[in-house]
């Protein structure tokens, strides 16, 4: 018996809930273990955009979908609480792997890897949050092995090893 898991990564603007549900119906047939949603980027208003609301609404997700958070600050924890309280998710994925120039320039996605102290503070805030602990919320991270060089990986991995992450995904 294989322990292989198959996940479908998101592509912003393409892999919304309609795509994920149709893909699973016609191709996945239950063979995909998780479908990652396009990232949600918390904002100052503490509200989701209409398209984000449609995408994260459990009524629109007939399959095992996982919300992805992209941030550069632990202030996004309100987003996680809303995802769990209002939509019933029990896992979030922190995106520390997106290589897009516009994302990296805001120190989000793989841009977080340039400052491992901040990355550690963010993970600490998430993992020590009472709500997340009390409700046994799983936290996974999508990352790269470095922002400039693969030699950065050891320092990055040292940060991740300090936390009980559900999974760590390496973005190629």
Regions inferred by a protein language model and the residue ranges of each:
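Conserved radical SAM core fold
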Residues: 39-46, 73-74, 97-110, 172
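N-terminal targeting peptides
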Residues: 1-3
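Alpha/beta enzyme core
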Residues: 25-30, 78-92, 96-102, 106, ...
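Short, flexible active-site loop motifs that bind/organize anionic cofactors or intermediates
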Residues: 9-10, 109
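Aromatic- and acidic-residue-enriched carbohydrate-binding clefts of CAZyme catalytic domains
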Residues: 113-114
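Glycine-rich, positively charged N-terminal anion/phosphate-binding segment
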Residues: 11-86
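Hydrophobic faces of well-ordered beta-strands that scaffold small-molecule active sites
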Residues: 6-9, 35-38, 65-69, 92-94, ...
